[in-house]
A protein has these predicted regions:
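A domain-start/cap signature at the N-terminus of enzymes
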Residues: 282-378, 741-742, 751
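Alpha/beta-hydrolase-fold serine-hydrolase catalytic core, especially in secreted/extracellular enzymes
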Residues: 315-317, 323-326, 584-773
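Alpha/beta-hydrolase active-site loop
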Residues: 430-465
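The feature captures the conserved acid-bearing segment of alpha/beta-hydrolase catalytic domains
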Residues: 506-618
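Recognizes extended acidic, P/S/T-rich segments that occur
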Residues: 179-272, 284
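Pro/Thr/Ser/Gly-rich low-complexity, intrinsically disordered linker/stalk tracts
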Residues: 145-196, 285-313
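Flexible, small-residue-rich N-terminal segments that precede or flank a structured functional core
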Residues: 24-58, 75-76, 84, 89-95, ...
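Cap/lid segment of the alpha/beta-hydrolase catalytic domain
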Residues: 398, 403-441
């Protein structure tokens, strides 16, 4: 156990009211209760919705440089208003107070406070709508000192890296720090600190000039955090309590930050030189007299940018995620900030895994279990399920045998890999701002950065990186990840070549069990919440069915998906609606269903052999004569289900099987089946010119018939021009001058899509040629 000096909460609370020297400065608080610098000075009349704050405790002529009305945090399960936060000076409804950064936990009211002080009157505000009420008023001013002794921060250091400034500091020694064995130990220690020292926060100030008590008025508050920010309490996700604790590194492969070190990462809005200071605030009170040299740092030269991930550590397992090595795992942390997060300095971990050996020249045993190095390498974004983490829960390491580099991250928050409202981590309401695709954006931002690392990675790991192929990006996942993967391919079809998802939610509003999970991220279904900058509800925007039907001409990646008809939590009707939308909007897809519940996998396993790329055309197969019938998602009568269950149980008993394992389809249609299960195509011989398109389509040997008919729509065209109304001729033949199977004409529709209806295909290879009509 490390022995650290303590500061006592008794001393902390002791009144030390002193005359303020000219250079003194502090943050005082005005409260409704008996706490704070000026207790019982804040009053709210619920009938008139008027808030009055008695400012007479401030010295005459005080130089006020910050005033913030801190809003109350909402209790768990409290209903969040859907109206925007509305607070304004009495008689001035057009002067609504705006949120004050960095965490949007309060409203900026500097000018109203200055006006009230100049007039010698109380601050009077109308409070129409807030998250959960008002907690206190904070006023930072010169010529003042706090009424109690506050702790001091030391060891402040700053370092800038690629658009982000890392501010580290030594937290005040609060207690003896024990030896931590697990994350549960750290969590218990943090809880004890919060109980002994409630509402302790560390604030980061930034200025263009050195920061002292005399110059603090020129500084801006840019950061605020609680204790123990050196602890990475999200790396292991739901296993955090059982695993040894992980501490952050703020330099590539450096030592972890010592316990008791705080960290805040700031993205400056403008380039230049800056100075920083860190204060300790207790219930909002600050003492800027405490800005000794150890509490300030700078100058540091800053640039504007998103920042770069920091390499935390490297692993070299021989086996991992059902693949054999040698392998390399690189673990990074990126402190996310808007526009990739609703709040600044939000650390999220990322994993990059790759095989280190090149593939053998000849045949070898079980190559599907190996992970190889190829260049340029395909890249797979792997999205974990509920309860998973970047270390697993996404099915497989897909296409590692083809050299695919795995990228995974932790899902924070649980937004099903889509996005969430700007209010997360703040004290905004659903009416303040909108929903952003933060999660999608941050993953693609990490991918963009990863594309550069073959040339820019630290020397110690650069040999493991290889050029990544932006044309061969795919997304894969299971359950929650199986919901996100198709959403990526549907909305980011120009970047995602293909996606594979098991048992996903495709229409969030129609998931029987998980609709509430989405509601925490999007707001109520019937609320007037929209996507940021768009006049559309997030419940529509993140519905794959809505998106496909409202963006018929936009290209999507190949979607490979599966759902269980008896998966009551995810929901079969919404899954079938997705499959129908894929068919009816003519998208490249393979979809299968079964009655294996939440364990229904795609027919494509860990290795997908078709070389799908974003710079190559794709075929959309629909209405294939070999497709099975999924039904209409109409529930079967209960008596019919029970009769079938009893029949299957009796059969199981006769065969010596467990009768409790029988499964019955609760809906109409075939209990198991697929769309496009027996069709494939060759990628190397595609012809795509302004006036001609050719592809070899394969009816696979495992097909249940020697012949089929199918509609074929070329998608993701690279050069073929298909304006509305343009006429085309087509032929279907056996390759290499083989017999003709069909010929005809087709016309581009209103969306610029050309569909060859019910063309015949024979088992094996079939050449389809489309040419502009003369």
């Amino acid at each position: 156990m490390k022995r650290l000096c303590r500061w006592s909460p008794l001393v902390l609370a002791a009144a030390v009211f002193c005359a303020a020297p000219a250079e003194a400065a502090c943050t005082a608080t005005f409260t409704a209760d008996d706490a704070g610098t000026f207790p019982e000075t804040l009053r709210f009349d619920r009938e008139t919705k008027r808030l009055t704050v008695d400012l007479s405790g401030l010295p005459a002529g005080a130089t006020v440089f910050r005033a913030e009305l801190i809003l109350q945090a909402a209790e768990p399960h409290r209903q969040v208003p859907t109206e925007p936060t509305t607070v304004y000076p009495v008689g001035a409804p057009d002067e609504r107070l705006a949120f004050a950064g960095p965490l949007d936990r309060g409203l900026a009211c500097l000018e109203p406070v200055r006006k009230a002080l100049a007039a010698g009157e109380p601050l009077r505000l109308v409070v129409e709508t807030t998250l959960a009420g008002v907690a206190r008023l904070e006023v930072s001013y010169l010529e003042g000192r706090p009424r109690r002794r506050l702790p001091k921060v030391t060891g402040v250091a700053v370092r800038h890296r690629a658009g982000q400034t890392f501010v580290t500091f030594r937290e005040p020694p609060l207690a003896d720090v024990p030896e931590f064995g697990t994350g549960a130990d750290v969590a218990a220690f943090r809880a004890s600190l919060a109980e002994a020292h409630p509402d302790l926060r560390f604030r980061v100030w930034r200025s263009a000039k050195p920061i002292t008590a005399e110059t603090i008025a020129a500084a801006r508050l840019v950061g605020e955090c609680g204790p123990l920010t050196c602890w990475n309490d999200t790396y292991h996700q739901n296993k955090t309590k059982k695993e040894p604790p992980v501490r952050y590194r703020v330099r590539d492969l450096a030592d972890p930050l010592p316990w008791g070190t705080g960290v805040w990462v700031h993205n400056p809005e403008a380039a230049g030189r800056a100075h920083y200071a860190v204060t300790a605030a207790v219930a909002g009170e600050e003492d800027f007299d405490a800005l000794a040299p150890a509490a300030v740092a700078g100058p540091v030269t800053e640039t504007v940018g998103p920042g770069e991930p920091v390499l935390q550590w490297v692993e070299h397992p021989d086996r991992w995620m059902y693949r054999r090595g040698p392998l390399t795992r690189l673990i990074y942390t990126r402190w996310e900030a808007p526009p990739r997060s609703s709040t600044p300095s939000s650390p999220i971990d990322y994993l990059v895994a790759m095989g280190d050996d090149p593939p053998p020249e000849g045949e070898m045993r079980e190559p599907q279990y190996r992970a190889y190095r190829v260049e340029p390498a395909p890249v797979g974004l792997h999205l974990h399920c509920w309860g998973g983490s970047l270390n697993g829960g996404y099915g497989w390491w897909y296409n590692a045998h083809r050299g695919a580099v795995l990228i995974a991250s932790n899902q924070i928050p649980y937004d099903w890999w889509t996005g969430y409202h700007a209010r997360r981590g703040t004290r905004r309401t659903w009416g303040d701002g909108g929903v952003h695709p933060y999660t999608m954006d941050r993953l693609f931002a990490f991918l963009d950065w990863a594309m550069t690392q073959h040339a820019r990675a630290p020397e110690a790991v650069r040999k493991h990186w290889r050029r990544l192929d932006p044309r061969r990006v795919f997304v894969a996942g299971s359950s929650m990840g199986g919901s996100g993967a198709p959403m990526f391919a549907v909305r980011r079809g120009r970047r995602v070549a293909w996606a594979l998802g098991w048992v996903g939610v495709h229409v969030p509003a129609e998931s029987p069990q998980f609709r509430s999970s989405y509601r925490h991220c999007y707001g109520p279904v019937d609320a007037p919440v929209t996507m940021a900058g768009r006049d559309v509800s997030p419940w529509d925007w993140f519905s794959d069915v809505w998106w496909l039907r409202h963006h018929a001409a936009e290209e999507t990646g190949l979607v490979i998906a599966s759902n269980g008809k008896n998966d009551g939590g995810i929901g079969w009707p919404q899954a079938l609606a997705f499959a129908r939308a894929l068919q009816e909007t003519r998208r490249p897809h393979m979809f299968n269903w079964d009655i294996q519940g939440h364990g229904t996998h795609t027919r494509v396993g860990a290795n997908f052999e078709i070389d799908v790329r974003t710079d190559r055309s794709l075929p959309a197969f629909t209405r294939c004569s070999l497709d099975d019938d999924p039904g209409t998602a109409t529930p079967r009568p209960k008596e019919e289900i029970e009769a079938e269950r009893e029949r299957l149980r009796a059969e199981a008993k006769r065969e010596g099987k467990n009768p409790n394992h029988v499964k019955v389809d609760p809906f109409d249609g075939e209990p198991r089946g697929a769309f496009n299960a027996h069709l494939a195509w060759e990628t190397e011989t595609i012809v795509d010119t302004p006036d001609r398109w050719e592809m070899t389509v394969v009816l696979q040997d495992a097909a249940p018939a020697d012949r089929c008919t199918v509609d074929l729509t070329p998608r993701r065209l690279q050069r073929l021009r298909t304006p509305k109304g343009r006429r085309f001729t087509y032929t279907v033949t056996r390759p290499d001058g083989g017999k003709s199977l069909a010929e005809g004409e087709a016309t581009a529709d209103a969306h610029g899509l050309v569909t060859l209806e019910q063309i015949p295909l024979l088992k094996g290879r079939n050449r389809v040629i489309i040419a502009a009509a003369k």
